[in-house]
Amino acid sequence: MVSTFSRKDQNYKNDDLNQPSKEGRFGKYGGQYVPETLMPALFELETAASNAWKDKLFVEELNHLLKTYVGRETPLYEAKRLTEHYKTKQATPRIWLKREDLNHTGAHKINNALGQALLAIRMGKKRIIAETGAGQHGVATATVCARFGLKCIIYMGAEDIKRQSLNVFRMKLLGAEVKVVNSGTATLKDATSEAIRDWVSNVETTHYILGSVAGPHPFPKIVRDFHAVIGEETKKQCLESFGSFPDILLACVGGGSNAMGLFHPFVKETSVRLIGVEAAGSGVDTDKHAATITKGSVGILHGSMSLLLQDDNGQVQEAHSISAGLDYPGVGPEHSHLKEIGRAEYGSVTDQEALDALKLVSELEGIIPALETSHAFAWLDKLCPTLEKDTHIVINCSGRGDKDVNTVASSLDI
């Protein structure tokens, strides 16, 4: 589905970009729709995070581990053959990749997992739970738990376990207990629901490392802030590489953490277009897609008000994507807000378009992107023909595709 965004669609004030509010709202989205038993834990987490960012020693430890353990900063790489491929008579899109796939564990997810593990230790919590879809957040969480000697339980849908058997083994090898979720569609939504149930029952001893910019306040802000290192590095690297900020930022969106990490430091730089790409699955006009912003309506899921895929009765519908990490019927509340005020644009691409993009990037650049990331690459087919001048485009290469090889092998005729 091609975006119809134009500059005149922007109708925000500066206050709209200073989010969330004290009540945890991004405009009308966000909030805390949770049982009373969780409210003290959410308040404790909000206070711990606020105090931690003011603590020089905490920030120094986080930055030291991001450098020596995660491997930051990640490179900004110019994809010259991809640039040549998308060159038109009107314009040359210079395409740059923010290489989050080169992080320890192979994706952006460890930025947040590491930060939240340090918060858990600060709060005296020894037991960690997390949900995972593609397995990357599960692997990242299991990794930091191994590093700090924390007990780790990962909830994962049975369907995703079939798709991501390699990551399941990695989590177990790292010492985590992987709990299979068979309820509902047995995918990310259901794994998240089970993790929240666990947290309600064990809130005194347990910290829930939520993996996306979704869930009740303060999670959307906390996850965003730990991932904002992506965009902060990108700002500096763009100035070093070509002397200005990029014209366009491009990222895939499921729950939306990798996109928010890239977008957030640029939100007030209103000359920079922010484009998120959702999973259209078999097509947005079918019932097999995960294009929440494109086709969703306002509702409440997992403690937050946001755009959701739901029927006329408000029942959450099944999402579908070949990518386990995008197979989610909701989206982070800040994305819903940025869409509503016109600051960000969102489109969607199908499973087949993502597969074709994965193959193209692999052949042209020698980089096998994750299926999630491939959705962002696929948007270049729609975006580049519309460009009227030479344009710097930064794509968040959010993860590597090793985990997806079996899925891709059964889908592509190579």
Curated annotation (Swiss-Prot):
GO terms for cellular component: cytoplasm. GO terms for molecular function: tryptophan synthase activity. It catalyses: (1S,2R)-1-C-(indol-3-yl)glycerol 3-phosphate + L-serine = D-glyceraldehyde 3-phosphate + L-tryptophan + H2O. Pathway: Amino-acid biosynthesis; L-tryptophan biosynthesis; L-tryptophan from chorismate: step 5/5. Keywords: Amino-acid biosynthesis, Aromatic amino acid biosynthesis, Lyase, Pyridoxal phosphate, Tryptophan biosynthesis. Its cofactor is pyridoxal 5'-phosphate. It is an enzyme of class 4 (lyase). The modification N6-(pyridoxal phosphate)lysine is found at residue 109. Its EC number is 4.2.1.20. Tetramer of two alpha and two beta chains. The beta subunit is responsible for the synthesis of L-tryptophan from indole and L-serine. Belongs to the TrpB family. NCBIfam families: trpB. This is Tryptophan synthase beta chain. It comes from Prochlorococcus marinus (strain MIT 9301). The gene is trpB.
